[in-house]
Regions:
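N-terminal membrane topogenesis motif
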Residues: 1-21, 75, 202-218, 283, ...
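Signature of the first transmembrane helix
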Residues: 3-61, 96, 156, 210-239, ...
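Interhelical loop/hinge segments that connect adjacent transmembrane helices in multipass membrane
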Residues: 4, 145, 169-173, 185-226, ...
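Interfacial/gating helices of multi-pass transporter permease domains
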Residues: 25-50, 169, 207-215, 233-253, ...
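Helix-loop junctions and terminal segments of transmembrane helices
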Residues: 26-27, 56-72, 248, 252-290, ...
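Membrane-interface helix-loop junctions in multi-pass transport and translocation proteins
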Residues: 30-37, 105, 113-114, 138-143, ...
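Membrane-interface junctions at transmembrane-helix termini in multi-pass inner-membrane proteins
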Residues: 124-146, 332-363
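Membrane-proximal transmembrane or re-entrant/amphipathic helices at the cytosolic face
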Residues: 412, 417, 435-494
Length: 494
C-alpha cells in the first residue's frame, strides 16, 4: 500500500503548482485583458460551471470510493471503471447538446460572448476523458504531480505567447479550454494501460443513478452556494461585480487549495479502512487528518482575511481593488468550508450517508436561494451581501452535520472541535498585529515598495506569533513537522 504521507506530499505538490501558475497567469491576464471582456469571460464561466457537473453526473466522488473498494480485484476494477465511464460519456454528450442550444437563455446576441461561449464548450466535451477519480483512487499521485507540472507550464507559455493585447479574450478562452482537454487526455491514456473496457448490460446502470444523483448534489454543493451567488450577480447585468466575486474567490481558493487538497488524499484510505472493518484506524486517521488540516488552513485563512484588499490589489491591479472586502470574506468562509469538508467527506460520505448529505445540502441551498432572492428582489446588488448569505447557509449546513454525527455516534467530534478552536485562537493574534503594524507604518493602497514591506512585516510577525504559541503549548503536530524538516535538511546537506 502506498504511503499516505508521500501521497499527501505529492498532492500538496500538485496544489502548490495549482497555486503558483494560476497566480502568474491570473495576474498577467487581469492586467492585460480589457475589464469588460474579462467580465464576459467570467459570466460565461459561471454558466459553464452550471453544466459541468451534469456532464460527469457525480461520477468523480462516487467513482473515487467505488474504485477504492475494488482496487485489489482486477475483474471488478475493470467492470466498475467501464460502467462509470460509459455513463459519463452519455451524460457528457447530452449535456453538451443542451449547453450549445441554451445560449439564448443566458445571453443576448453579443458576438464576443457567443465566441467565448462556444469555445468554452470544448471543456464540456473534454469531460468524456475526465477520469482523475481513478488515479486518485489508485493513489497515483506522483503521476498526477508530473502531469500537472507539464500542463501548467504549457498553459503558462501559451498565455504569454498568444494573449498579448486587451481584446485577446477569445484566444485566452481557447488556451484554457485546450489545456483542459489535453490534461484529461493524458490521464485517460495513462489509465488505459492497466484498466480495460468490459461489456456492461443496461440493467447494471440502473442501481447507479440514485447514489450518483446524491453525489452530484453533494460534490457540487457550490452550485447552491457560491455559484448561485454568481448567477444572481450575472442577472443584475453588472459584469464587474461578477469579476470582483470570481477573482476574490479564485485568489482564496487557489491559495487555500494546497491544504484542502492534502486532506482529500485520505478519503480513499478512510473508505478502505471502513470496508475492512478497521474502525480504530479510521477514527485515528480522521482525527489526525483534521488536526493537520486545521493546523494549516486556519492561520492561512485568517492571514488572507486581514490582507484581503492587498491580495486582490497585487493580483489584479488597482482596477479590481473593489473586490478587497470580498477576498477577506472568502478567507473567513474557508474555515467554515473546511469543517464542512471534514464532516461531510471524511465522516458522513465514507460511512455511506450520501442521502443525508444530499438532504442537508438541499436544505442549506434553499436557505441561500431564499436569502439571495430577497437581496435581488430589494435591488441590493452589492456582491459582499450575496457571499454573506452563502456563509450563513454553510454554517447552517455545518450545524446539521454536527447534530446528525452526534445523534448517530459516528465519531466523537470533541477532538476536531478542540483543535479548531485552539488554532483559531492562536491565529486571532494576526488581527492585533495587522492593526499595530498599520498604526506604526501606514501605507496607501497602491502597488509600491512600502506596500510590500508592510505586507512582509505583517506576515513575518504573524508567523512568529503562531509558531511561538505552538512552541509554548508544545503542539505535537508542529514538532512532528519540525522533525521532518530537520531530517530533510540533513539529507540535503549530505
Amino acid at each position: 500500500m502506498k504511503s499516505i504521507k508521500l501521497n499527501a506530499l505529492a498532492f500538496m505538490g500538485i496544489r502548490v503548482l495549482n497555486i503558483i501558475f494560476p497566480i502568474l497567469t491570473g495576474t498577467y491576464v487581469a492586467r492585460v485583458l480589457d475589464r469588460t471582456d474579462y467580465g464576459y469571460f467570467n459570466s460565461v464561466d459561471t454558466i459553464l460551471s452550471f453544466f459541468l457537473p451534469f456532464a460527469t453526473y457525480g461520477v468523480y466522488n462516487y467513482g473515487l470510493r467505488a474504485i477504492s473498494n475494488v482496487k485489489d480485484n482486477k475483474k471488478e476494477l475493470n467492470k466498475v471503471f467501464s460502467s462509470l465511464f460509459y455513463l459519463c460519456v452519455a451524460c457528457t454528450i447530452i449535456t453538451t447538446l443542451v449547453y450549445v442550444f441554451s445560449y439564448p437563455l443566458f445571453f443576448t446576441a453579443n458576438p464576443i460572448i457567443k465566441k467565448i461561449y462556444l469555445v468554452m464548450g470544448v471543456q464540456l466535451v473534454a469531460q468524456i476523458f475526465s477520469i482523475e477519480w481513478v488515479n486518485e483512487a489508485l493513489e497515483n499521485y506522483s503521476f498526477l504531480f508530473y502531469k500537472t507540472a507539464f500542463i501548467r507550464v504549457l498553459m503558462l507559455v501559451s498565455i504569454f505567447l498568444f494573449v498579448k493585447n486587451e481584446h485577446d479574450i477569445v484566444v485566452y478562452t481557447l488556451v484554457m479550454s485546450l489545456s483542459t482537454l489535453i490534461n484529461y487526455l493524458i490521464s485517460y491514456f495513462w489509465i488505459k494501460r492497466d484498466i480495460k473496457f468490459v461489456k456492461v448490460s443496461l440493467s447494471e446502470f440502473k442501481p447507479l443513478f440514485l447514489p450518483l444523483t446524491a453525489m452530484l448534489i453533494f460534490a457540487n454543493a457550490n452550485m447552491l452556494f457560491t455559484f448561485l451567488d454568481r448567477l444572481f450577480l450575472v442577472k443584475t447585468g453588472i459584469d464587474v461585480n461578477v469579476s470582483y466575486y470570481t477573482i476574490a474567490q479564485r485568489i482564496v481558493t487557489v491559495i487555500a487549495g494546497v491544504v484542502t487538497g492534502a486532506i482529500g488524499v485520505s478519503v480513499p484510505r478512510l473508505s478502505y479502512y471502513l470496508g475492512k472493518g478497521k474502525k480504530e484506524e479510521y477514527v485515528n486517521l480522521v482525527n489526525r487528518g483534521s488536526r493537520i488540516f486545521n493546523f494549516f488552513i486556519i492561520p492561512l485563512s485568517i492571514g488572507l482575511m486581514i490582507l484581503g484588499p492587498q491580495a486582490i490589489l497585487v493580483y489584479g491591479s488597482e482596477k479590481y481593488i473593489g473586490g478587497g472586502i470580498l477576498t477577506s470574506l472568502f478567507a473567513v468562509r474557508t474555515i467554515i468550508l473546511a469543517l464542512d469538508t471534514i464532516l461531510g467527506s471524511q465522516i458522513l460520505f465514507t460511512n455511506g450517508y450520501e442521502r443525508r448529505i444530499t438532504l442537508y445540502t438541499v436544505f442549506a441551498g434553499i436557505l441561500n436561494l431564499i436569502l439571495d432572492s430577497l437581496l435581488y428582489f430589494y435591488d441590493i446588488y452589492t456582491p459582499e451581501y450575496y457571499l454573506i448569505t452563502t456563509m450563513l447557509s454553510e454554517t447552517f449546513l455545518l450545524i446539521l452535520y454536527i447534530l446528525f454525527i452526534n445523534k448517530r455516534k459516528l465519531i466523537n467530534l470533541r477532538h476536531i472541535l478542540k483543535y479548531t478552536l485552539r488554532y483559531s485562537l492562536f491565529s486571532s493574534t494576526f488581527i492585533l498585529i495587522y492593526f499595530l503594524v498599520n498604526f506604526i507604518y501606514p501605507v496607501q493602497m497602491v502597488i509600491n515598495l512600502p506596500l510590500f514591506i508592510n505586507m512582509f512585516i505583517i506576515m513575518a510577525l504573524s508567523a512568529l506569533s503562531y509558531i511561538g504559541l505552538l512552541v509554548w503549548t508544545k503542539d505535537s503536530i508542529f514538532y512532528e513537522f519540525l522533525g521532518h524538516f530537520i531530517s530533510l535538511k540533513k539529507r540535503v546537506i549530505k
